[in-house]
Curated annotation (Swiss-Prot):
Cofactor comment: Binds 1 Ca(2+) ion per subunit.
Residues given in the record as Ca(2+) binding sites: 47, 49, 51, 68
CDD domains according to UniProt: PLA2c (cd00125)
Family note: Belongs to the phospholipase A2 family.
BP GO annotations: arachidonate secretion; CD4-positive, CD25-positive, alpha-beta regulatory T cell differentiation; inflammatory response; lipid catabolic process; negative regulation of T cell proliferation; phosphatidylcholine metabolic process; phosphatidylethanolamine metabolic process; phosphatidylglycerol metabolic process
GO-annotated cellular components: extracellular region
Protein name: Group IID secretory phospholipase A2
Glycosylated residue positions: 89
Amino acid sequence: MELALLCGLVVMAGVIPIQGGILNLNKMVKQVTGKMPILSYWPYGCHCGLGGRGQPKDATDWCCQTHDCCYDHLKTQGCSIYKDYYRYNFSQGNIHCSDKGSWCEQQLCACDKEVAFCLKRNLDTYQKRLRFYWRPHCRGQTPGC
């Protein structure tokens, strides 16, 4: 089990930095929450990280489920959520998405901004036991968007 987890982290560490939108999200979450996303959030609960199923486990997991819905909507609009790179500024604890990019880039930034601040609002209920949560335990109906 530990070896599989380590392999998963190595794969994720190799994928995240080379993809545009994911690179933005990773940086934004780190700036807003102060946590290293690849260790704290991408393998968290039933919805944080790649894919998602079942009932979210806590408020942090709900942030990720809502973010999944935001990305799903952008995909239906033809946006390349994992490749589009957007510009934003982080200043005095706030995020300002640039209005110079395409519609998809602006909306992608808005989705990522929302999840970053949602995660920050729920830092006090973050549960270490939900990091690296075993996804087969994610049961129940997946909430709709």
